[in-house]
């Protein structure tokens, strides 16, 4: 344990010192680092994909489910998206040093706010090798140093990607310890990292309930997190039929193992006949297992009667729960009870009810006539995301550059003294 603690202490000290140097880093230097990383990944994609295949083979042998394997898998399309995200983040405005709300007060002083970095961010993640790059890019651009701890299932992929990061940071003239990777897979390292409040300013976990529970029980460092992605799509009585079918199908089937996939479909009883038969047929053709309320079960003998547990389950699989409701109020009541406050969407052509839905539904993202799969930092123009927060403090929704900063007050005077 002492050796693990010593390792985390060393990484923490290095990261804290690196964070101090990042405060004065120019936007050009930070952007150059991101562009360098993109180029390194492009040049080394063969070795990255080879490392990823090794991780996939090991994970299949260990019996990882399809959802986790999908998160783990890299291909040329996903690598292209990583590179695209890096370039997009490089092109975003640098939030650090931005001064807002500068106003004269009655005393004659000017008071405003300046945006500053948080300091040192610890990112603990499972199954997603792309997080290695997303997290580094967002932290560097927002002036934060980062300590990465990936899961054992992605150890080869993470190492291949981190090699690209390490070379690129030093080439840009930044402190090499701006981004560090914990090499040991000993789980004690996670516990020590989340307790390292002398060095780490925030922890961002990306993983399952087991990981989040372990972190929450041990952490002395603030956590930016979401527990589940129990997302809902509600088809209103004034929904456009084709929009409803297209949105509901995409929201479930685009990717099953992601937190923005719809897990429960709510349908107004007045549009069941013109929407659900076609939608059910499409789901079944795609291989989606359907579970429904008693009214839904009557529509097809292939639909399994849903249990109380289904409404509060994040499947991360080709499974969907369907419930028929008599009103929007009933739909909102269901969402209030079972939602994880991640993302909800209404399909409706009625302006008043759509506004009511986005006002009354208290999730981190609420949508009108759009698939829940859009709940993503890249799609929101953030250049990517380091995670999605369902908490109400300090940031909510996809966490991009601004979410990795805070504001401090600045006061400008000209010899002012307080009487």
Curated annotation (Swiss-Prot):
Protein name per its UniProtKB record: Gamma-glutamyl phosphate reductase
Higher taxonomy: Bacteria, Pseudomonadati, Pseudomonadota, Gammaproteobacteria, Candidatus Pseudothioglobaceae
Keyword presence, Cytoplasm: yes
Any Gene Ontology biological process: L-proline biosynthetic process
Matches recorded under NCBIfam families: PRK00197.1, proA
Function statement: Catalyzes the NADPH-dependent reduction of L-glutamate 5-phosphate into L-glutamate 5-semialdehyde and phosphate. The product spontaneously undergoes cyclization to form 1-pyrroline-5-carboxylate.
Matches recorded under PROSITE patterns: PROA
EC category name: oxidoreductase
Source species of the chain: Vesicomyosocius okutanii subsp. Calyptogena okutanii (strain HA)
Pfam families registered for this protein in UniProt: Aldedh (PF00171)
InterPro entries for this protein: Ald_DH/histidinol_DH (IPR016161), Ald_DH_C (IPR016163), Ald_DH_N (IPR016162), Aldehyde_DH_dom (IPR015590), G-glutamylP_reductase_CS (IPR020593), Glu-5-SA_DH (IPR012134), GPR_dom (IPR000965)
GO molecular-function term, one example from the UniProt record: glutamate-5-semialdehyde dehydrogenase activity
Cellular component, GO annotation: cytoplasm
Subcellular location(s) of the protein: Cytoplasm
Reaction catalysis annotation: L-glutamate 5-semialdehyde + phosphate + NADP(+) = L-glutamyl 5-phosphate + NADPH + H(+)
Known pathway: Amino-acid biosynthesis; L-proline biosynthesis; L-glutamate 5-semialdehyde from L-glutamate: step 2/2
